[in-house]
Design a protein with these regions (language model features):
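Phosphoinositide-dependent membrane-docking surfaces
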Residues: 41-58
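Short polybasic amphipathic segments
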Residues: 7-11, 33-35, 70-72, 79
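Mixed-charge, low-complexity intrinsically disordered segments
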Residues: 54-79
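Short aromatic-glycine motifs in intrinsically disordered, low-complexity regions
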Residues: 30-42
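Alpha-helical protein-protein interaction elements
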Residues: 34-36, 47, 66
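Anionic N-terminal interaction surfaces
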Residues: 1-31, 59-64
Length: 79
């Protein structure tokens, strides 16, 4: 049986920094032009892409993941 045992929110900034957030320990909300993580605001004009990485576990010996794009700045070609 496959199940998700951990989710990680990844925020890729235009200055090539990446913020990794464990969703089980942090609250986040997506808005039209910003994202808030534990009451700290990040505006999309500074972000290239936001993805959700879901770690899947079929059995206790193998770990795989899938990464889904939640938001992307399509005007910016730097992914």
């Amino acid at each position: 049986m496959i199940y998700i045992y951990k989710e990680e929110l990844l925020i890729y900034f235009k200055n090539h920094l990446t913020l990794s957030i464990d969703t089980s320990k942090n609250n986040f909300k997506l808005y039209q032009n910003k994202i808030t993580v534990n009451h700290k605001t990040y505006y999309f004009k500074h972000i290239s892409k936001i993805t959700l990485k879901e770690y899947l576990n079929e059995d206790y010996d193998t770990d795989t993941y899938r990464e889904r794009t939640l938001w992307a700045n399509w005007k910016n070609d730097k992914f």
